[in-house]
Amino acid sequence: NERTLSANDPAFTLRTLGRLQGDLSGRITYTYNPGFVFGVVPGRALAPGEFGQLLYQVEGCTKRVSRVLDDGSVEERSRSWMVYCDADTGEYLQEFHNPYTDETIVVPAVRGGPSVSRLTLNGPILPASLGLESTLLDTPPRLHWRVLGERVWISRYAASRISVANSKPRNELSMDAWVCHLSDLLDEQATHIPSTYTWTSHADWQSWLQMQDHPGSLLWRVESVVMHEKEQLPSRLLAQLERVAPGQINLPLP
């Protein structure tokens, strides 16, 4: 089965990414993105519960339209939203008590925004305003494949640096992983590949945590699924987005 995957063909890899992340027919998709964010402080001989601890949960979604351009690249137009939730209860946060600084701080109401990007045979093309350096850029797309019977595990990793005005650069090592059916992957007529998706990221502290020079970093774990109807998203998330970003989910994509 591995031989039929064209695993070393950048064009097959590119189309696979487009079909996993969205629907190449041009149909709108909604990716539901719930997850957990941990604080990790290594090298200080801390007790297990202090070395690593769950800080908060996140919940969000990405509305996306994908299409194949004449040159074979995939254009993705999207808008994303992410909100923060209590580590234990999952209730949406307005304030957060930082266990490292012992300060109570205001939580951003919502994160995210619009984006237009392109997947190409020489890596993704992203808006220059992102200030992003990444090992994914300027290189053919590559995925790692494992096949066992009808199951396929697909993964990739990237190291990145995001530079934002008036703040220090933020470094990140991220790992993407999809699990899908081999028959869906090999179906050349299918414009979308159903899968479960996991994003794991080891990254610097978020600026709103006000960590200053406190040692340590964040470990993100987000598990996602792509759907075709807005109504398939959790009703509580839709209600929260209407509170913090009224009407945005119904706006046309950029």
What residue ranges belong to the model's regions?
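A eukaryote-biased signal for long
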Residues: D138-P254
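Predominantly extracellular/secreted and cell-surface proteins with exposed
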Residues: E50-S183
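Intrinsically disordered, low-complexity regions enriched in small/polar residues
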Residues: L14, Y32-P34, F38-V40, V58, ...
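Low-complexity, compositionally biased segments
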Residues: T4, F12, G26, T89, ...
